[in-house]
Design a protein with these regions (language model features):
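Sec-dependent N-terminal signal peptides
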Residues: 1-17
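Structured extracytoplasmic
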Residues: 19-194, 201-208, 212-231, 236-249, ...
Length: 310
């Protein structure tokens, strides 16, 4: 649950950008001046929108570890979930296929299908409602904050060039402006955020992001989640097939209260793997896993094996 709140707050998490073709003319990382951060952010925003079709074509496996801490900061409970992330009826969903290393029973799978159907219906309605108001949204209907608004809500500083995974990358630090006026709770999250972004210089896409929150913030007015200040996150993205950037790993740590009832204090670690592309509109192939025409995941015997912790 903490992961959902962290990803929502990160804004860019879960968004995947189109990758530019590899250039044959390699330029030394320090041989040219850094582009203006504002210009770079607008390019990232444009690339995200242009990559929408490619994002829909991909599915991947998601392994999630949730470690809950006791009052002394020691791990008291660990929950492991394996899912298949896919675009189903226009909505990006994570269909659970196993919990704690055990595949779902037929009864559990039926309940999961019901949950997915309700989630798709809810997200589709929210997307149509927000888009009818002229808002730009993701596939789940959440309103996207534009690059222009992010620049109004905070400041980017200390731009520099580094090499990340062998690729020239531009890094900049971000600090929200506590005096900035916000229009909704999502903007409040961005305003209260302090962190760092890594932008791939060739593709102009987000490659990594990390940050922490200076104040408490609420999702859905606190009805969905109430995240406490000091909560932090880090997300990394992977270039797949030289055409698209997909989620790689996400880590989050902090305190959150869910649905005004259950509290959670701990750490979450997510690893995405087994990236596959639709060959036809019916079946996802490539790699070892297959998804049936109705979207039901058919994991291989090793699909529920937790990936190694980085």
């Amino acid at each position: 649950m903490l992961l959902l709140a962290v990803l929502y707050a990160a804004g860019w998490s879960g968004q995947m950008q189109a990758a530019a073709p590899t250039s044959k003319a390699d330029v030394t990382a320090d041989a040219k001046p850094l582009p203006p951060i504002a210009e770079l952010l607008h390019d990232v925003e444009r690339n995200q929108k242009a990559a929408e079709t490619q994002r829909k074509d991909y599915t991947y496996h998601v392994h999630l570890d949730e470690q809950e801490f006791d009052g002394k900061g020691q791990v008291k409970k660990t929950v492991r979930t394996d899912s298949e992330s896919m675009n189903l009826r226009g909505v990006r969903i994570n269909r659970v296929v196993a919990r704690d290393g055990k595949p779902l029973t037929p009864e559990q799978a039926a309940k999961e299908n019901e949950r997915i159907d309700k989630e798709i219906a809810r997200d589709t309605e929210r997307r149509e409602k927000n888009q009818s108001k002229g808002e730009s949204t993701d596939s789940r209907g959440d309103v996207l904050i534009s690059a222009s608004r992010i620049l109004e809500l905070g400041t980017f500083s200390n731009p520099r060039r580094v090499t990340l995974n062998g690729r020239p990358t531009i890094v900049a630090d971000y600090a929200g402006d506590p005096n900035a006026k916000t229009r909704n709770s999502a903007e409040g999250v961005i305003r209260d955020l302090v962190g760092t972004v890594w932008i791939d210089e060739q593709d102009h896409t987000l490659a990594r992001a990390q940050g922490h929150f200076l104040n408490d913030f609420k999702i859905g007015g606190g009805l969905v989640a109430d995240v406490k200040k000091g909560s932090s996150f880090e997300a990394q993205f992977i270039r797949v097939n030289n055409e698209v950037w997909l989620p790689g790993t996400v880590d989050g740590q902090g305190k959150v209260r869910i649905l005004l009832v259950s509290g959670f204090s701990g750490h979450v670690h997510l690893v995405a793997s087994d990236y596959r592309k639709f060959r036809t509109s019916a079946t996802i192939v490539s790699g070892d896993a297959i998804v049936a025409p109705d979207g039901t995941p058919l994991p291989t015997a090793g699909a529920t094996t937790p990936p190694p912790h980085p």
